[in-house]
């Protein structure tokens, strides 16, 4: 049963078959695992709002995208190997786009790569430490202190005076105005 184990919604045998291209050369298994949800999200961004996408269309588009990524990736990998490098650089992909006839994609991709590198240099990909917890805020000098989160919670639970005036259900009406139910009769 190990061969029929599900992974990403596909049978593992199907993944292995998808990883072998039609010319018999083995592609990488990661190409066959291009996330369908991400692809469908991209498709929905370019279609009109109420357009529906059939299951067969999703599958065919996924297969085409996997084939395209593999095709361009193999060409970029060959460029890196020709220069005796094991790491495929973004410039290898740019060159493979040009060599394969996708010239109009080279300039936008180059601009994106340049912007991404600037973002990285500026430290944009580093996780920022969360801000320190809010300092306690004194309500009155010498009185109790509450954090901003506690104040927000209290404001959501305790009705404001304006709510009391309009609802007519406040125990403070006719009382001393403290809003805690202490009326004249108590």
UniProtKB/Swiss-Prot annotation:
Residues in the DNA-binding region are: 34-40
Q: Which gene encodes it?
A: NFYB1
Which classification does the entry list for the species? Eukaryota, Viridiplantae, Streptophyta, Embryophyta, Tracheophyta
Name of the protein in its database record: Nuclear transcription factor Y subunit B-1
Keywords of the record: Nucleus, Transcription, Transcription regulation
Chief place of localization: nucleus
Q: In which tissues is it expressed?
A: Expressed in developing kernels.
Q: Which InterPro entries match?
A: CBFA_NFYB_domain, Histone-fold, Transc_fact_NFYB/HAP3
Function (record text): Component of the NF-Y/HAP transcription factor complex. The NF-Y complex stimulates the transcription of various genes by recognizing and binding to a CCAAT motif in promoters. May act through association with MADS-box proteins. May regulate the expression of genes involved in flowering.
């Amino acid at each position: 049963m190990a061969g029929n184990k599900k992974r990403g919604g596909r049978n593992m045998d199907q993944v292995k078959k998808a990883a072998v291209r039609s010319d018999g050369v083995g592609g990488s298994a990661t190409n066959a695992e291009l996330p369908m949800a991400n692809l469908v999200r991209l498709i929905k961004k370019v279609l009109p709002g109420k357009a529906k996408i059939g299951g067969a269309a999703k599958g065919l588009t996924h297969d085409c995208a996997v084939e395209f990524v593999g095709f361009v990736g193999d060409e970029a990998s060959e460029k890196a190997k020709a220069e005796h490098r094991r790491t495929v650089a973004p410039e290898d992909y740019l060159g493979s786009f040009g060599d394969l006839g996708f010239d109009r994609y080279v300039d936008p991709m180059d601009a994106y790569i340049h912007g991404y590198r600037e973002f990285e240099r500026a430290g944009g990909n580093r996780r920022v430490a969360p801000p320190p917890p809010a300092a306690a805020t004194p309500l009155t000098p010498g009185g109790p202190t509450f954090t901003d989160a506690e104040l927000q919670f209290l404001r959501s639970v305790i009705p404001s005076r304006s709510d009391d005036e309009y609802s007519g259900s406040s125990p403070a009406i006719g009382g001393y105005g403290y809003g805690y139910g202490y009326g004249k009769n108590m």
